[in-house]
Amino acid sequence: MTYRPATDPPDLDTLTLGVEEEFLLLDSDTGESMPVAARVLDGLSGTAYEQSRREFRHSMVEMVTPVVSDLAELRRHLVALRTAAAEAAESAGAHLVAVGATPVNETHRTVPDEPRYHAMSRRFGPVAHDPAVCGCHVHVGLPDRELAVQVCNHLRPWLPVVQAITANSPLHDGQDTGHASWRAMQLERWPSIGPTPYFDSAADYDATVADLIKAGIMLDAGMVYWYVRPSAAFPTVEIRVGDVCPTVDDTVLVAALVRALVATLAADVRDGARATRIRGCLVSAAHWRAAHDGLDGDLVDLRTGHARPAWDLVDELFALVAPALERQGDRAYVLDQLARLRDEGTGAARQRRILERTGCDVRAVLAHLAAQTRPVPA
């Protein structure tokens, strides 16, 4: 289709941001999940309480930043929200942990007493009671919905790279799974989670979602959990592919890259560029490889279908978005953070180094995760 701009298109150099981070509540001694979310939320006050959300497990909480316009403001909110949630978790006898999948065990898998959660549990059975997983969802303001759908099409080749950068869940049931993101593997059991299909238009998107609801694949439009989507609730493009990041700096890096990528691709759409229709099986394979290798191996370059070193694709992603980052004032920050990431590795790589150093002491990994989750006071 040919994109027709909205009457008042957004300034692509000043796109707004918002971030949702999901966290586990774990026992500090055993690492097992603790069903104390209600106590944690009740322990919050002020802005932190207003920006908190109940999640699909009693052992999870979500913290949501306000809409922001720059990275410094985003970082301040992330630090404040993580600090408040960590303190409330400690008061409830738990650690707040930013990790993509339940690392040890989840004894209590009942869902909170809310009609929607019960409906999901009835419809999807044991899948709804899999161990809890935590993601990082980045919203980029893009009120033109037609433009948002086309940007989603253009994002498809780059989302495995974003997924690899965020990989932060190698453990399951106390063992190394061999995957950098076990969260991604676990979520494949849901029928409405995974790579976003290609859509010709916003009308095509809406018709497909309506068909899936009629077919019983999802309860409503809120259950479109594809890796990127026009948000069902906000005038944004929502990127949902990533594990929750271990540190605030990791989250800000991902948000900066995603915003610059959306700005770059939205400009391409306005200039008449059409997204390539990539075969769904190849897109799925690329995401599997990203979840398996993270940044410590190869990724599938969806522009060619060939496997390439992961960091080559990260470098090409940076080169693509560097002009947008420059205009947004974020280029130097992102360059520094990518250098740090190259040195430290993904969250999954950091966990594995601790396992190797401690003789597979999972408790040491959990202590490390809890320490990374809570920002160090300035």
UniProtKB/Swiss-Prot annotation:
Keyword Ligase annotated: yes
One term of GO molecular function: glutamate-cysteine ligase activity
The EC number(s) this enzyme carries: 6.3.2.2
Domain of life according to the entry: Bacteria
Reaction(s) catalysed (UniProt annotation): L-cysteine + L-glutamate + ATP = gamma-L-glutamyl-L-cysteine + ADP + phosphate + H(+)
Biological-process GO terms, alphabetical: modified amino acid biosynthetic process
Alphabetical UniProt keywords: ATP-binding, Ligase, Nucleotide-binding
Residue ranges that the Swiss-Prot or TrEMBL entry lists as coiled coil: none
Spans through the membrane: none
Keyword Lipoprotein appears in the UniProt entry: no
PANTHER family: GLUTAMATE--CYSTEINE LIGASE 2-RELATED
Task performed by this protein: ATP-dependent carboxylate-amine ligase which exhibits weak glutamate--cysteine ligase activity.
Family: Belongs to the glutamate--cysteine ligase type 2 family. YbdK subfamily.
Stated name of the protein: Putative glutamate--cysteine ligase 2
